From Swiss-Prot:
<keyword id="KW-0732">Signal</keyword>
<dbReference type="GO" id="GO:0043657">
    <property type="term" value="C:host cell"/>
</dbReference>
<keyword id="KW-0964">Secreted</keyword>
<feature type="short sequence motif" description="RxLR-dEER">
    <location>
        <begin position="86"/>
        <end position="106"/>
    </location>
</feature>
<comment type="similarity">
    <text>Belongs to the RxLR effector family.</text>
</comment>
<comment type="function">
    <text>Effector that suppresses the host mitogen-activated protein kinase (MAPK)-based plant defense activated by the Phytophthora elicitor to promote colonization of the Phytophthora pathogen. Neither directly inhibits MAPK kinase activity nor interacts with MAPK proteins but acts downstream by suppressing transcriptional activation of resistance marker genes such as FRK1, WRKY22 and WRKY29. Confers avirulence in the presence of resistance protein Rps1k in host.</text>
</comment>
<feature type="glycosylation site" description="N-linked (GlcNAc...) asparagine">
    <location>
        <position position="100"/>
    </location>
</feature>
<feature type="signal peptide">
    <location>
        <begin position="1"/>
        <end position="20"/>
    </location>
</feature>
<feature type="region of interest" description="W1 motif">
    <location>
        <begin position="129"/>
        <end position="147"/>
    </location>
</feature>
<keyword id="KW-0843">Virulence</keyword>
<keyword id="KW-0677">Repeat</keyword>
<protein>
    <recommendedName>
        <fullName>RxLR effector protein Avh331</fullName>
    </recommendedName>
</protein>
<dbReference type="InterPro" id="IPR054463">
    <property type="entry name" value="PexRD54_WY"/>
</dbReference>
<feature type="region of interest" description="W2 motif">
    <location>
        <begin position="222"/>
        <end position="240"/>
    </location>
</feature>
<dbReference type="Pfam" id="PF22748">
    <property type="entry name" value="PexRD54_WY"/>
</dbReference>
<feature type="region of interest" description="Y2 motif">
    <location>
        <begin position="250"/>
        <end position="271"/>
    </location>
</feature>
<dbReference type="GO" id="GO:0005576">
    <property type="term" value="C:extracellular region"/>
</dbReference>
Length: 279
């Protein structure tokens, strides 16, 4: 069974056996609302690829029969969103015929799933999750886990999920939501990636659309950490990147660009500090 790092309850619908599996996670004890992930597995019909997570919806406990009434909260985006949503609509409306299983009898309204699929088809795969996570008050730390960026061995450079997270975090910060700021974003990335690799990652994303301003702020936070540690630009190669002789690096090595950018940052802030001391 696929593992999800967050949001309370996972419900998987089989395309053949028609069984609905629910699994509570540890967050159930800390969050007041119930949420559901609708996800697919590799054993399902070939029209849905493994890992295509389609919907995150809230579930309010029914007042009478103890049944869950589903309402739209969010939807995950993957590269297979277009295929996935079409298949979701098809399965949601035909599940009784194909598997002889009544979702209604399980306390779930199949029309909700159909509406979820129709709603997803109006959004692009690149922004679906971010827009709906914002609607669902998902914070960047949770989004980091939902995207699998907290998993051991994950690659960050050239990872589209990393860019998606940065875009989401910028949108989250622009909405001035409390509890997570630029300092929190840098601390999260620094803890997971480390200073040297983080600086290279941010360099690779400095021109990223809808995220470049946040990338620059995170870069300044990293440079500020080195500056506060009194690391001189000429020391950065050996102290941080463990390079004994920078002259042996290719001219297009991104480490040289990081060192040069840090030198500019260092000079600027040294001039600022000197001006304060003169005053």
């Amino acid at each position: 069974m696929m593992q999800w790092s967050a949001i309370l309850i996972r419900t998987c619908f089989s395309g053949s056996g028609g069984e609905a599996l629910t699994c509570a996670t540890s967050e159930q004890q800390t969050r007041p609302e119930l949420c559901f992930f609708f996800s697919v597995r590799s054993s399902w019909p070939s029209t849905i690829s493994d890992g295509a997570c389609l919907a995150l919806v809230s579930a309010e406990q029914g007042a009478t029969a103890g049944r869950n009434t589903l309402s739209l909260r969010s939807m995950m985006a993957t590269e297979d969103m277009a295929t996935s949503t079409r298949s979701l609509r098809s399965q949601a409306t035909n599940v009784d015929d194909d598997a002889n299983v009544s979702i209604e009898n399980r306390g779930m309204n199949p029309s909700v799933l159909t509406k979820l699929g129709e709603f997803a088809s109006t959004l692009t795969a690149g922004n679906t999750a971010n827009k709906l996570w914002l609607m669902a008050d998902v914070d960047p730390k949770s989004a980091f886990k939902l995207l699998g960026l907290d998993m051991p061995g994950v690659r960050f450079i050239d990872n589209p999920k990393m860019l998606q997270w940065l875009k989401f975090t910028k949108a989250y910060l622009d909405m001035k939501k409390s509890g997570f700021g630029e300092t929190s974003a840098h601390a999260l990335l620094y803890e997971k990636i480390g200073g040297p690799d983080l600086s290279l990652l941010l360099l690779s994303l400095k021109d990223a659309p809808d995220a470049n301003s946040l990338v620059q702020k995170l870069t300044n936070s990293q440079f500020g950490m080195w500056h506060d540690a009194r690391i001189e630009p000429e020391q950065l190669a050996q102290t941080v990147f463990k390079i004994q002789d920078v002259r042996k690096l290719p001219k297009n090595d991104p480490k040289l660009q990081v060192i040069d950018d840090y030198a500019k940052y260092h000079r600027k802030h040294r001039k600022f500090l000197n001006s304060i001391m003169i005053i």
